[in-house]
Amino acid sequence: MISTVSLFWALCVVCIVNMARYFSSLRALLVVLRGCDPLLYQYVDGGGFFTTHGQPNKQMRLVWYIYAQRYRDHHDEEFIRRCERVRRQFLLTSALCGLVVVSLIALMIWH
């Protein structure tokens, strides 16, 4: 029989792998954005996005841009596809992180 603790750790590993995929897709999106729309790239702090001196308020602009699906009116098809992929991965990763938290609470109650 599979233990609940091992299932919890497997869920954590899946969540971490999906986070890595999300950040990789976000980095690829920023590369495409730099080429197709330099003004938007500067607007969302594309150059400093993954650095310690990045500006979180500018980074949140990209998050809200993707969340509100404002990219649908963009002229570049590859950029639209990348935004869709990042949005789906963000929703999946958020759901998995929520499931990890719920699982952790359940493990604390039952053990």
From Swiss-Prot:
Membrane-spanning ranges: 1-21, 90-110
Keyword Disulfide bond on entry: no
Top-level taxon of origin: Bacteria
Subcellular location: Cell inner membrane
GO (cellular component) term, any one: plasma membrane
Protein name as it appears in the record: Universal stress protein B
Record membrane topology: Multi-pass membrane protein
Classification via Pfam families: UspB
Keywords tagged on the record: Cell inner membrane, Cell membrane, Membrane, Transmembrane, Transmembrane helix
Entries under NCBIfam families matching the protein: PRK04960.1 (NF003435)
Main location: membrane
Family listed: Belongs to the universal stress protein B family.
Source organism of the structure: Salmonella arizonae (strain ATCC BAA-731 / CDC346-86 / RSK2980)
Entry-linked InterPro entries: Universal_stress_protein_B
